[in-house]
A protein has these predicted regions:
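Walker B catalytic acidic pair
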Residues: 105
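A metal-dependent hydrolase signature that marks the N-terminal structural subdomain at the beginning
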Residues: 1-67, 72, 83-86, 91
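Walker B beta-strand of ABC/ABC-like P-loop ATPase nucleotide-binding domains
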Residues: 102
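Active-site scaffold of zinc-dependent metalloenzymes
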Residues: 51-99, 109-130
Length: 130
């Protein structure tokens, strides 16, 4: 489904603003970027097949791997608009998909791997049912 740019950016801003304060306060020197699709270089770096979809990408040095030196260039979290729109049938689903993608990429910033992120996703999902 096609959503307008303002609506998408509103949901993205909401998702970034909803990062819990104990994590948001530790997000330093991170740029959130909105692109239509992953670049050929990003797809190649991740060894993505042509039919694979990517909603977001964290590029940088995860917080636990840093040695205390100051970085001049920011880490980057890129959110990919077209794949998220294609996977969303309603505005509510788009909002949820953007929120989950932002949370997922922020988790990578904090050094979490996909296994741990999946475990936390299950906990978050179960908690939201309570």
């Amino acid at each position: 489904m096609e959503f307008n740019e303002d609506e998408f950016e509103k949901y993205l801003t909401e998702a970034i603003d909803s990062v819990p304060s104990q994590y948001a306060s530790r997000l330093q020197n991170v740029a959130f970027i909105l692109e239509d699709y992953p670049s050929p270089e990003q797809r190649l770096k991740l060894n993505l097949y042509p039919n694979e979809t990517l909603f977001g990408l964290y590029e940088g040095v995860p917080l636990p791997a840093r040695n205390g030196t100051v970085k001049l260039l920011p880490d980057k979290i890129t959110i990919f608009k077209q794949p998220l729109q294609a996977a969303s049938r309603t505005p509510a689903q788009l909002r949820e998909n953007i929120g989950h993608t932002v949370w997922h990429e922020v988790a990578h910033y904090f050094g979490l791997d996909h296994t741990r992120i999946h475990e936390l996703d299950i906990k978050r999902h179960n908690k939201s049912k309570e």
